[in-house]
């Protein structure tokens, strides 16, 4: 019996415990009441249907109360794993034309659950009768040798179509895809397939962009090919690169219904890249359109071997098997497709159709003997048009290809055969709706003994991956929207001076405004994989440079601008390119500190200064920034120098000299007296002036219990020096003083002088 063969084919147990036991028993009891004379059968297995009178013949899918009860019983039996008994009930319902394909959803789901994932379920080996024609078989003979010569590193494959990268476009998130794969994305799916970042730049200059212009929106720039990566792929892998171009040309011809011309393109592409699963999968669809079903099956089987977890390859194999009359094998493949993607309505629909047809053993054998697959999909037996079962994700992700070519159409092809061809489009990209468990990692194929990658190292030159700015190996490579790649630090330094690409002069104001530079993932992996020693040396140079920049005693960056004091806030407006670089380096090294000195017409900058610590930076779209910093320590300049356009210095830090005994008591009295005098002066100011001081410098610090506790002295002293109406040259000596007593006396004299002038 066909049901027994199905069970053996899938290695399904006769009975499996299930939570649906009570439902099954209730269905069986109901059937027992309706059927009457079969109480024992109803309790143990499927109940037979009463004899049908000829005059009671019903149209397909007509439901009666007893058929509904038996359908419930069959679904419950299938849920329990009692597939044999469930199939018997389904068969009887089908013979009475009281069963439609849509009612087999529960059976298909249960069968698909029995299909193990991964290596446990390799698709069934092909029949001897499914061998392709001599031409295609000859191609397979030399495929292994050619594949070994053109084996491509997995990193060079597009993560949307899973084929070799063609016209690679690197997005702002750092991931790279084929240009055509990105252009075919609809508005709702315009996101990176890997990280999910929304990509407004995917709207190219088409009708969608014109619609944006009509709506008053600025259309995004067109997608640009990654210049370095495209040239490198063409140099290292001319075969796969050319094959990818031929694939896209064949896709275009197929959409234009030039099926024979598309086949020629794919034949040439397969010779250049015989290990590309996408080529075989797409060519299988072309053969199917041309009604060369044996060749279609042959190519689909190769695609399944190259990518065992690929949904489309198994789906096309199943369609070819069904057309050739091999319903059992087709059902197995359709169930495998359902296990890969349970949400795919097309696979479920076809599996339900094959399940419905399978019990009619004699008709199936006759159809297989005739080689006519059209009877397998008799629309009189199956309710509904399969065209409505297109998966939503596929409709949005793939551009529709009409599989009916005028040249390929034949009067012998049945109506249902045309429907089946319309269901299956050449995949320009894989569906994104694949389940995670199936799409994360593919199990090893027959080519598992081959190395994971094969690169023609003789033609590989490290100079192909050199930055055009520093002339060194890319370190943290970043690709601009115009398609050029630079080291991250090199690009940032260029944007400090001009918001344009250093090579093509395209505007990069958007990059400057967002300041979100994502490293190019594929280029980083490429360098790490094939140039490990060069990368090690490059990283060593970078780390040495960062270590030198993080030294706060030698070559300390100096901002020549104004006076700064310990504990006093110092907001800065940064707009000069050299200081943009300096501030960025201070943040990158983690020190977040730099020196502030007054300018000197003779020496360049003053001998004494103050270290500032960056608390926050607010960037503007044009590259300018406002830095919120605060004074930390005083220093003395030992040696001046320059680095990349800004001043640096070797410095030594200075502190106040502590006193003890009577000198300490005298210092305490002086400290209290000057603090009181300073507080009276501040409170005597006009309210408007006082508010301006408070908004800029904050409130006056409290008096310290021990004025010598801080190596730089009391915080209120520095606050008072910052707000006193003194010229910078008059304030500088206070910064250089190492005696707190001298500093307090100086502040007292200044306050006395100001008070006399006010009076």
From Swiss-Prot:
Disulphide bonds in the chain: none
Protein's name in the database: LON peptidase N-terminal domain and RING finger protein 3
The UniProt record lists the keyword Metal-binding: yes
GO cellular component: a single term: cytoplasm
Residue segments, region Disordered: 1-69, 360-454
Residues annotated as domain Lon N-terminal: 546-755
Polar residues bias locations: 57-66
Entry's Gene Ontology molecular function annotations: zinc ion binding
Keyword tags: Metal-binding, Repeat, TPR repeat, Zinc, Zinc-finger
Pfam family membership, one: LON_substr_bdg
TPR repeat windows: 67-100, 243-276, 278-310, 312-344
Domain of life, source organism: Eukaryota
Effect caused by changing residue 122 to G: In a breast cancer sample; somatic mutation
Compositional bias of kind Basic and acidic residues: 380-393
Zn-finger (RING-type) residues: 158-196, 467-505
UniProt organism field: Homo sapiens
PANTHER family assigned: LON PEPTIDASE N-TERMINAL DOMAIN AND RING FINGER PROTEIN 3 (PTHR23327:SF41), RING FINGER PROTEIN 127 (PTHR23327)
């Amino acid at each position: 019996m066909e049901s027994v063969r199905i069970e053996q084919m899938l290695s399904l147990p006769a009975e499996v415990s299930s939570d649906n036991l009570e439902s099954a028993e209730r269905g069986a009891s109901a059937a027992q009441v309706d059927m009457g004379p079969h109480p024992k059968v109803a309790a143990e297995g499927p109940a037979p249907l009463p004899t049908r009178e000829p005059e009671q013949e019903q149209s397909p899918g007509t439901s009666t109360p007893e058929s509904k009860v038996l359908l419930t019983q069959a679904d419950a039996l299938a849920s329990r794993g009692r597939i044999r008994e469930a199939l018997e009930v389904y068969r009887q319902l089908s013979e009475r034309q009281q069963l439609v394909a849509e009612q087999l959803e529960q059976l298909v789901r249960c069968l698909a659950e029995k299909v193990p994932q991964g290596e446990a379920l390799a698709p069934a080996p092909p029949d001897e009768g499914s061998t392709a024609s001599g031409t295609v078989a000859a191609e397979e003979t030399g495929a292994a040798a050619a594949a070994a010569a053109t084996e491509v590193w997995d990193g060079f494959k597009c993560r949307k179509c899973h084929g070799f990268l063609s016209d690679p476009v690197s997005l702002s998130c750092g991931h790279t895809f084929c240009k055509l794969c990105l252009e075919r994305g609809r508005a709702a799916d315009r996101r990176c397939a890997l990280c999910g970042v929304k990509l407004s730049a995917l709207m190219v200059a088409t009708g969608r962009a014109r619609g944006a212009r009509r709506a008053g929106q600025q259309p995004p720039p067109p997608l640009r090919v990654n210049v370095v990566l495209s040239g490198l792929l063409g140099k290292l892998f001319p075969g796969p690169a050319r094959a990818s171009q031929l694939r896209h040309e064949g896709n275009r011809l197929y959409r234009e219904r030039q099926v024979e011309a598309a086949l020629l393109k794919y034949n040439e592409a397969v010779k250049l890249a015989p290990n590309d699963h996408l080529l075989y999968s797409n060519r299988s669809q072309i053969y199917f359109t041309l009604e060369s079903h044996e060749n279609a099956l042959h190519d689909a089987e190769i695609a399944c071997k190259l990518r065992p977890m690929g949904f489309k390859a198994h789906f096309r194999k199943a369609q070819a098997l069904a057309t050739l009359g091999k319903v059992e094998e087709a059902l197995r493949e359709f169930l495998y497709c359902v296990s890969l993607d349970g949400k795919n309505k097309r696979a479920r629909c076809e599996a339900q159709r094959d399940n419905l047809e399978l019990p009619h053993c004699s008709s199936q054998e006759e159809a297989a003997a005739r080689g006519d697959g059209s009877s397998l999909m008799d629309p009189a037996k199956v309710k509904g048009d399969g065209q409505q079962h297109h998966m939503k994700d596929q409709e949005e992700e793939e551009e529709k290809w009409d599989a009916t070519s005028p040249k390929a159409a034949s009067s012998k092809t049945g109506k249902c055969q045309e429907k089946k061809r319309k269901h299956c489009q050449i995949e320009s990209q894989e569906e994104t709706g694949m389940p995670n468990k199936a799409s994360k990692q593919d199990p090893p194929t027959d080519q598992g003994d081959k190395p994971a990658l094969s690169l023609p190292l003789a033609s590989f030159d490290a100079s192909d991956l050199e930055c055009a700015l520093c002339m060194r190996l890319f370190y943290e490579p970043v690709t601009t929207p115009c398609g050029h790649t630079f080291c991250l630090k090199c690009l940032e330094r260029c944007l400090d001076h001009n918001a344009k690409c250093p090579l093509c002069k395209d505007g990069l104001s958007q990059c400057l405004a967002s300041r979100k530079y994502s490293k190019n993932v594929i280029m980083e992996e490429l360098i790490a994989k094939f140039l490990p020693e060069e990368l090690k040396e490059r990283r060593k140079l970078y780390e040495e440079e960062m270590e030198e920049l993080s030294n706060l005693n030698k070559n300390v960056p100096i901002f020549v601008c104004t006076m700064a004091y310990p504990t006093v806030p110092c907001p800065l407006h940064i707009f000069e390119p050299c200081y943009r670089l300096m501030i960025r380096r201070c943040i990158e090294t983690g020190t977040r500190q730099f020196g502030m000195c007054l300018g000197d017409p003779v020496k360049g900058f003053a001998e004494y200064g103050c270290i500032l610590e960056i608390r926050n930076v607010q960037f503007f779209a044009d590259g300018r920034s406002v830095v919120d910093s605060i004074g930390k320590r005083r220093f003395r300049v030992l040696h001046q120098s320059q680095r990349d356009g800004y001043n640096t210095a070797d410095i030594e830090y200075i502190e106040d000299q502590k006193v003890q005994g009577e000198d300490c008591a005298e210092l305490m009295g002086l400290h209290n007296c000057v603090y009181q005098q300073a507080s009276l002066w501040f409170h005597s100011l006009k309210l408007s002036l006082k508010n301006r001081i408070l908004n800029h410098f904050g409130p006056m610090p409290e008096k310290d219990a021990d004025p010598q506790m801080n190596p730089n002295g009391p915080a209120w002293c520095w606050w008072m020096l910052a707000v006193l109406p003194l010229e910078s040259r008059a304030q500088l000596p206070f910064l250089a003083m190492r005696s707190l007593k001298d500093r307090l006396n100086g502040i007292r004299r200044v306050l006395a002088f100001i008070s006399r002038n006010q009076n």
